[in-house]
């Protein structure tokens, strides 16, 4: 797309908005003020738009001709009355049932929710919450994503802060990632025309984006007059990689239905800083909708034995996208955790992330398996079994476990022998194991009473190194005017594998270990003493940032932002020989609050 082409699209959009403004001008003063501004803008743009656009035939009174589309991919017919009643005033519906813009895109529930919020905030659309939820549900179900399309970008919906690398096109990644993750892009499907209109939207909302983000390397060289703009390159790639119509969506939409997931589920997971947990989730179908459910989860942390009960509700969009919200018993109503999970085909497994926080930074990874008549294995704690260890107590959790079982029936594989059954009940089995000193290092599957758990335990002979995760963390000061963004760290132990070399493909992850945590200065600016002002870290690895705003105790009256090293120190206890401590560190950036956000900090999903 040339610069003139981009201007033409923008002018067409402005002309369309001008038509809406003219139709909306009535005797209401609040509407008159807003509409007059747009009408004045029309006077400056209509002439240029008319010159850029070929003359069209006569348009019947009260209708607006839909702009000619270069991409002839057929759009989706929209029949929902709530959508038509609330959206057709601007998004014109043609005789076949296609609506401008809306019929030519597909998104996740979060993507449609953001569009609805943007219409309310920026276009003054008056929409009550019930209608907004109904519209979001309709589009998520009828113009959503197939499982194969949604899974590569699930980290976006699960609000994970990860270092994702988009490898399909490096130029597109450079163009888009300056402002948002590629997960937001990968969670959408559009026609080429819609991708181009999205470009126009970016330029309309952010007029300096061409120079601040799209050309981050500076202006183009003088001899590049014919070179395509970075956004033109991105649009070409996105239209090819993420088109509106795909075989995956055609196949999924043909068989899509509300999942029948009511009943008991075995829950297992891990929360950074608190460790693994296991329990049960009871799912009850709503009496009013087949895709809405109420939930009750009860689970216990392996370290410390804390028992948590949560009650909530959930909607499953597009037949597989679980979106829920639950509260811990006795906790304030505003402390709810959001739940994002994927229901696997067959309706026997679910997995995802539950999270909370001002920036969704607190979270736990969860996996669920449907409970049937037979035994189900959920987790093993501790997973790490040291070679040569004797009388090591291990707890196996699950459901429908046999009360009467023999030690030899609990099979951890070669080199691991169960010597004693300490306690057995339907939800847990406590055993004592012995590991041969010559046992091969690596993962072990567990088999018990016809049930299996892949990678249930890890056999190791020594801890070669530790790694702090995340390797690059970020926190935001807050607490005065904006919420704080915390950062949770974990220390993971590793075995170097058969080649005895670190950071190679055969390395074995042993799992989280208890360490001593501390902060050290990150040498960026001489004598800035960031470590004194940015915040503190506790012995669970949780970093708490300082207050936002200027600090009079700091030179230059600066904010409490900066860079520090997060340092973990681990003392191995292998055969009681007092091995030397192992250290690892990660970089932590403590920055300012996120001052401008499209999405509110709190609200209904």
Residues of each region from the PLM?
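Beta-strand/beta-sandwich contexts
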Residues: 369-408, 425, 453-503, 600-604
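Edge beta-strand at a domain terminus
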Residues: 247, 255, 336-379, 584-594
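Gly/Gly-Pro-rich "capping" loops immediately C-terminal to redox-active cysteine motifs
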Residues: 92-122, 181-207, 309
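Immunoglobulin-like IPT/TIG beta-sandwich domains and homologous Ig-like subdomains
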Residues: 388-451, 510-513, 520, 530-534, ...
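C-terminal capping alpha-helices of c-type cytochrome domains
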Residues: 124-154, 208, 213-252, 256
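Central antiparallel beta-sheet cores of small beta-barrel/beta-sandwich binding domains
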Residues: 180, 255, 259-346, 351-358
């Amino acid at each position: 797309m040339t610069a003139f082409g981009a201007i033409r699209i923008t002018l067409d959009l402005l002309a369309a908005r001008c038509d809406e403004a003219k139709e909306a001008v009535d005797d209401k003063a609040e509407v008159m003020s807003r509409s007059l501004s747009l009408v004045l803008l029309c006077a400056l743009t209509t002439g240029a738009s008319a010159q850029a656009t070929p003359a069209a035939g006569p348009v019947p009174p009260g209708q607006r001709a839909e702009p000619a589309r270069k991409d002839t991919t057929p759009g989706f017919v929209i029949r929902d009355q709530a959508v038509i009643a609330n959206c057709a005033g601007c998004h014109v519906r043609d005789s076949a049932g296609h609506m401008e813009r809306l019929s030519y895109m597909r998104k996740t529930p979060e993507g449609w929710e953001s569009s609805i919020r943007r219409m309310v905030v920026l276009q003054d659309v008056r929409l009550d919450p019930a209608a907004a939820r109904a519209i979001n549900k309709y589009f998520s179900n009828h113009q959503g994503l197939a499982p194969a399309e949604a899974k590569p970008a699930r980290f976006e919906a699960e609000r994970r802060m990860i270092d994702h690398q988009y490898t399909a096109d490096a130029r597109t990644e450079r163009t888009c990632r300056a402002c948002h993750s590629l997960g937001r892009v990968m969670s959408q499907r559009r026609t080429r025309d819609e991708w181009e209109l999205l470009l126009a939207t970016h330029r309309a909302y952010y007029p300096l984006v061409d120079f601040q983000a799209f050309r981050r390397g500076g202006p183009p060289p003088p001899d590049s007059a014919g070179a395509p703009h970075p956004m033109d390159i991105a649009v070409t790639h996105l239209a090819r990689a993420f088109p509106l119509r795909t075989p995956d969506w055609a196949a999924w939409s043909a068989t899509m239905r509300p999942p029948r997931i009511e009943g008991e589920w075995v829950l297992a997971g891990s929360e950074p800083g608190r460790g693994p947990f296991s329990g049960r989730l009871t799912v009850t179908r709503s009496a009013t909708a087949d895709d809405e459910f109420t939930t009750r989860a009860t689970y216990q942390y392996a370290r410390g034995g804390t028992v948590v009960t949560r009650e909530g509700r959930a909607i499953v969009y597009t037949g597989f996208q679980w979106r829920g919200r639950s509260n811990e018993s006795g906790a304030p109503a505003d402390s709810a955790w959001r739940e994002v999970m994927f229901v696997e085909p067959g309706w026997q497994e679910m997995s995802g992330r539950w999270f909370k926080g001002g920036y969704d930074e607190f979270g736990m990874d969860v996996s669920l398996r449907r409970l049937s008549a037979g035994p189900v294995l959920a987790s093993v704690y501790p997973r790490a079994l040291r070679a040569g260890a004797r009388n090591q107590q291990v707890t196996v959790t699950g459901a429908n476990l046999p009360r009467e079982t023999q030690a030899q029936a609990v099979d951890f594989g070669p080199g691991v022998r169960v010597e004693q059954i300490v306690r057995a009940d339907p939800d847990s089995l406590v055993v004592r194991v012995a590991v041969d000193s010559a046992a091969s290092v690596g993962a072990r599957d567990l088999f018990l009473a016809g049930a299996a758990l892949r990678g249930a335990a890890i056999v190791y002979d020594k801890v070669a190194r530790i790694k702090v995760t995340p390797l690059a963390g970020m926190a935001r000061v807050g607490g005065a005017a904006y919420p704080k963004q915390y950062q949770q760290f974990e220390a993971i132990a590793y075995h170097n594998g058969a080649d005895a070399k670190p950071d190679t493909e055969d390395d074995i992850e042993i799992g989280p270990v208890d360490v001593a945590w501390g902060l050290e200065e990150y040498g960026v600016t001489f004598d800035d003493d960031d470590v004194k002002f940015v915040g503190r870290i506790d012995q669970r690895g949780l970093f708490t940032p300082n207050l936002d705003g200027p600090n009079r105790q700091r030179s230059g009256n600066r904010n409490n932002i900066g860079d520090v090293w997060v340092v973990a120190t681990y003392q191995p206890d292998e055969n009681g020989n007092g091995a030397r401590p192992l250290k690892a560190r990660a970089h932590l950036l403590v920055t300012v609050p996120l001052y401008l956000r499209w999405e509110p900090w709190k609200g209904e999903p």
